[in-house]
Amino acid sequence: MVTIRLQRGGAKKRPFYQVVVSDSRCARDGRFIERVGFFNPVASGSAETLNLDLARIEHWVATGAAVSDRVAKLIKDATKAA
């Protein structure tokens, strides 16, 4: 099953998440199919907190990809801000 979920990066105590499309059997930070955005929860100043390619996300959902709970909230925030 294909899933749209967060992939953790960044440094210790400074998380940075890539929003990726991956096979649900792959590890959290493992192989992925496509990167569709990022989420920076500790952005400061004028740094961008959230950037999603909503067109690609809609494409993957239309093909049957499941969306994780946190990514669903991020998509809702991104559509409200756009």
From Swiss-Prot:
GO terms for biological process: translation. It comes from the Bacteria. One of its GO terms (cellular component) is cytoplasm. Coiled coil: none annotated. The keyword 4Fe-4S does not apply. SUPFAM superfamilies: Ribosomal protein S16. Keywords: Ribonucleoprotein, Ribosomal protein. GO terms for molecular function: structural constituent of ribosome. Belongs to the bacterial ribosomal protein bS16 family. PANTHER family: 30S RIBOSOMAL PROTEIN S16, SMALL RIBOSOMAL SUBUNIT PROTEIN BS16M. This is Small ribosomal subunit protein bS16. It comes from Aeromonas salmonicida (strain A449).
